[in-house]
């Protein structure tokens, strides 16, 4: 338990219990794990609230209906995708620099389908994320949900989705919860690896993001997936198909 906590101080007793079962084949009930954590003074790191919500584009070229309508359950991979962009900061001396992460999340297995990291929050950031997802999942035609950020309301982006055979869906104005699984992933990433740290180079920040997404997809178990990782959930579906 101390090893799990030392490797990931963000984990509370419930996630420690899940890791014991998943990674070490040790079955123990939550109350016992909680008692041991208290005796060893094991506490999860402070949880920060994620307040991110993209502002609507000033002059949207295309707005889709909220076709997802908070129906976040999916029966198979590539049935429903969500996407968003989030911002990070790093410091070089007294200068503050920004970095932007665009990602696509699958609502069936909660895996990160694709992501792109760039210095600017612009159309290519989002367009390239979609292109990477299509390349990694040929033939996929998911319902594609986003907020009303300027990239997603761009006519070129709409045409890219249409060419790929994807139906577009958008959150209602100012309704962050319409995109809550994606917003939730940002919160998880930032709570577990970003908040409370000061990054002093671009490379350090990029390495953190890339390594975390690999960890999230391949090693981080989730209770809503049946104490499986996103990749395990994805592979189980493929084996059963």
Enumerate the predicted regions with their spans.
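Mobile genetic element proteins and their domesticated derivatives, centered on retroelements
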Residues: 1, 16, 33, 37, ...
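Basic, flexible linker segments flanking DNA-binding modules
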Residues: 1-76, 175, 229-238
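Conserved, non-catalytic sequence blocks in retroelement Pol enzymes and Pol-derived host proteins
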Residues: 9-10, 25, 72-73, 91, ...
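RNase H-like polynucleotidyl transferase catalytic core
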Residues: 46-52, 144-148, 162-181, 197-200
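An active-site-proximal beta-strand-loop segment
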Residues: 70, 74-113, 119
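Active-site beta-loop-alpha junctions of metal-dependent nucleic acid enzymes
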Residues: 97, 116-137
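Acidic/histidine-rich, metal-coordinating catalytic segments
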Residues: 139-154, 172, 228-231
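C-terminal domain-tail junction helix/linker
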Residues: 162-166, 188-241
